[in-house]
């Protein structure tokens, strides 16, 4: 049954973007080391504030609802932020909320082609954070699977089509497609030598995720994680990941998902 109030709430960002942003990103306002975990926010956001110069060029691959875009909009020049979000609904919303930031309705992969983006739905909740170019097998917990056609492009091809003189940082959150992206980004990595922050979660990989991390290390990187008390980088080892208990996978104070790769 059509619910006009639900429809109005979903499209409120068109009526008043400023008010909508203040509500959507409320937990990011006045974010500190003292409240970041109780607000269930990725602590790497605070770290980025400390290490990125204002002129840094930042790629947000898998922008989602825009947490990183919102936070970095106050730190970097907005014209130096490039955000990729292939989900049509999220892309449309982000373009309206952040008119000065560069958004691309593209998926980054190892091929330039038309692809299918899928994400599960439970009842009426769309699980955008699980959107993937991989085929999703229907599970009992999912009400249905939503799919849409999207354009995939190699990062090398995209970079070659732009006039970008520097590239400092690439944040990657693309649900198991990390290596596909990097396989299409060899020229970019070798030329710009950007720092990478890659969200790698075991539930989206058949192989042990250290195998994924090792392949990225072979591109000339060292792997690190953000220490939860020191808020500085520490070397990442297989033992650290092995000691993690998946029961805490949604607790950013106890579980490491964002792996930070520094170019050698």
Task: Locate the predicted segments by residue.
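Phosphate/nucleotide-binding beta-alpha loop and adjacent structural elements of enzyme active sites
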Residues: 1-264
């Amino acid at each position: 049954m059509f619910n006009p109030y639900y429809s109005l709430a979903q499209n409120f960002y068109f009526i008043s973007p400023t008010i909508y942003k203040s509500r959507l990103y409320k937990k990011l306002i006045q974010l500190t080391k003292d409240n970041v975990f109780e607000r269930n926010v990725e602590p790497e956001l605070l770290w980025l504030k400390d290490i990125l110069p204002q002129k840094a060029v930042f790629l947000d691959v898998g922008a989602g609802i825009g947490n990183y875009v919102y936070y970095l909009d106050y730190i970097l020049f907005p014209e130096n932020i490039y955000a990729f979000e292939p989900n049509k609904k999220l892309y449309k919303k982000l373009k309206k909320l952040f008119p000065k930031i560069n958004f691309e309705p593209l998926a980054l992969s190892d091929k330039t082609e038309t692809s299918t983006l899928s994400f599960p739905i439970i009842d009426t909740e769309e699980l955008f954070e699980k959107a993937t170019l991989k085929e999703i097998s229907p599970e009992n917990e999912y009400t249905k699977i939503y799919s849409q056609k999207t354009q995939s492009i190699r990062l090398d091809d995209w970079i070659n089509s732009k006039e970008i003189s520097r590239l400092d940082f690439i944040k990657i959150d693309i649900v198991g497609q990390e290596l596909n992206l990097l396989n299409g980004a060899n020229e970019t990595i070798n030329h710009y030598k950007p720092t990478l922050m890659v969200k790698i979660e075991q539930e989206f990989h058949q192989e042990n995720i250290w195998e994924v991390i090792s392949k990225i290390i072979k591109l000339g990187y060292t792997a690190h994680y953000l220490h939860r008390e020191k808020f500085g980088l520490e070397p990442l080892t297989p033992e650290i990941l092995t000691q993690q208990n998946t029961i805490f996978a949604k607790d950013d104070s106890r579980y490491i998902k964002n792996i930070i790769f520094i170019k050698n």
